[in-house]
């Protein structure tokens, strides 16, 4: 098994605590409201496993994440994608480490480290990461637009 890591930073005018609440703490409720392709998000067991189900006809049926850390004091979350169509037969898991920090005039910088844990001797291609990052940024931009349009939400 190999590991390929990528880092990324994104800035936004949204305060870090608001963005963390929206993207991490209340994502089970907010994401299905904002993204019609997401049917629902189910918590399993003690809540450390989250299953995101997609609507019928979507190219992705579901994704399952294991939540390792949600630190609302330091605005950090760590989780891994452990099941789902995205992993295919080449990936064991994908780990995410996100930190939300104050930046600029009340805004935020979101710093992420993504680690792809591959099966066997498979080497991840940059294009595969770029596609996943593109989809993640689409979600980020949708939530950002919602928070900008609704300044009292998660305030």
Curated annotation (Swiss-Prot):
<comment type="similarity">
    <text>Belongs to the BetVI family.</text>
</comment>
<dbReference type="GO" id="GO:0038023">
    <property type="term" value="F:signaling receptor activity"/>
</dbReference>
<dbReference type="GO" id="GO:0005737">
    <property type="term" value="C:cytoplasm"/>
</dbReference>
<dbReference type="GO" id="GO:0010427">
    <property type="term" value="F:abscisic acid binding"/>
</dbReference>
<dbReference type="GO" id="GO:0004864">
    <property type="term" value="F:protein phosphatase inhibitor activity"/>
</dbReference>
<keyword id="KW-0568">Pathogenesis-related protein</keyword>
<dbReference type="GO" id="GO:0009738">
    <property type="term" value="P:abscisic acid-activated signaling pathway"/>
</dbReference>
<dbReference type="InterPro" id="IPR024949">
    <property type="entry name" value="Bet_v_I_allergen"/>
</dbReference>
<dbReference type="Pfam" id="PF00407">
    <property type="entry name" value="Bet_v_1"/>
</dbReference>
<dbReference type="GO" id="GO:0005634">
    <property type="term" value="C:nucleus"/>
</dbReference>
<dbReference type="InterPro" id="IPR000916">
    <property type="entry name" value="Bet_v_I/MLP"/>
</dbReference>
<dbReference type="InterPro" id="IPR023393">
    <property type="entry name" value="START-like_dom_sf"/>
</dbReference>
<dbReference type="GO" id="GO:0006952">
    <property type="term" value="P:defense response"/>
</dbReference>
<protein>
    <recommendedName>
        <fullName>Pathogenesis-related protein STH-2</fullName>
    </recommendedName>
</protein>
<dbReference type="InterPro" id="IPR050279">
    <property type="entry name" value="Plant_def-hormone_signal"/>
</dbReference>
<keyword id="KW-0611">Plant defense</keyword>
């Amino acid at each position: 098994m190999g590991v390929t890591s990528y880092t990324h930073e994104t800035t936004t005018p949204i305060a870090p605590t608001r963005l963390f609440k929206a993207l991490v703490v209340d994502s089970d409720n907010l994401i299905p409201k904002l993204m019609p392709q997401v049917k629902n998000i189910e918590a399993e067991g003690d809540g450390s496993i989250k299953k995101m189900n997609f609507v019928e006809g979507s190219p992705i049926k579901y994704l399952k994440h294991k939540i390792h850390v949600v630190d609302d004091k330091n605005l950090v979350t760590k989780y891994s994608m452990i099941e789902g169509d995205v992993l295919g037969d080449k990936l064991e898991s994908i780990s995410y480490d996100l930190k939300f920090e104050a930046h600029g005039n009340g805004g935020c910088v979101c710093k992420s480290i993504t680690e792809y844990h591959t099966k066997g001797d498979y080497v991840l291609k940059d294009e595969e990461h770029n596609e996943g990052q593109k989809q993640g940024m689409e979600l980020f931009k949708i939530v950002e637009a919602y928070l900008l349009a609704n300044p009292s939400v998660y305030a």
